[in-house]
Amino acid sequence: MAENERTTENFQPQDPSYAEAATTEASAAEATGFIARIDQLAAENSDLQKKLADYEQKYTRLMADFDNFRKRTQREKDELAYFVSAKLLKDILPVFDNFDRARAFAQPDNEREEKLHNSYQQVYRQFLSVLEKMGVTAMEAIGQPFDPAQHEAILREESAGVSQETVVAELQKGYLLADKVLRPAMVKVAIPEAGS
């Protein structure tokens, strides 16, 4: 057996093309394996690219949905704040009207009454300032064309001097809150005469 082992150890192929063919076959098999692996990686890359595009699309839709949600929530919050303010201010306006009427009718006769009148004037200006800070503005009605969205016609009279319905007197002041009608003005309206 020792002799067989020696012969196997010393065995060298006689034909050099045999070694070259074996190397070529190994290289071809190795190249085929590389090509198969490249094809596999390309397929995985393609799948990952599709998944990435899908996730990017979902992300974009999600961000748009969130932005719409944020805008809707802000709009609802603003509407609620407006509603609460409008309700409170509608309750306060009659008090303000009465204060204004009392202020207008007060005719001080002596120094003491004059001081009291001046105090009322200061409170009135402060009250008016608070309303303005809250976004309340008085409507200008007299001389304006009648607008049923802003005016409530209490009285009507025919007049030759007008070509369209026009507000000629204001019986109760109207107010706006953030450019929306808080309370319509109660007005007297002049309408064109029937023959004109």
Swiss-Prot record:
Location in or out of the cell: Cytoplasm
Q: Give the residue ranges for region: Disordered.
A: 1-24
- List the CDD domains: GrpE (cd00446)
Any idea which UniProt keywords this protein has?
Chaperone, Cytoplasm, Stress response
Its BP terms in the Gene Ontology are: protein folding
Q: What is its main location?
A: cytoplasm
Q: Which domain of life is it from?
A: Bacteria
Recorded hits in Gene3D superfamilies, A to Z, give: 3.90.20.20, Head domain of nucleotide exchange factor GrpE
Q: Which GO terms describe its cellular component?
A: cytoplasm
Give the matching InterPro entries: GrpE, GrpE_coiled_coil, GrpE_head
One of the record's GO molecular function terms: protein-folding chaperone binding
Function according to Swiss-Prot or TrEMBL = Participates actively in the response to hyperosmotic and heat shock by preventing the aggregation of stress-denatured proteins, in association with DnaK and GrpE. It is the nucleotide exchange factor for DnaK and may function as a thermosensor. Unfolded proteins bind initially to DnaJ; upon interaction with the DnaJ-bound protein, DnaK hydrolyzes its bound ATP, resulting in the formation of a stable complex. GrpE releases ADP from DnaK; ATP binding to DnaK triggers the release of the substrate protein, thus completing the reaction cycle.
Give the family, as the similarity comment puts it. Belongs to the GrpE family.
PANTHER family given in the database record: CELL CYCLE AND APOPTOSIS REGULATOR PROTEIN 2, GRPE PROTEIN
Description of how the protein assembles with itself and partners: Homodimer.
The name of this protein is Protein GrpE
Which gene holds the coding sequence for this protein? grpE
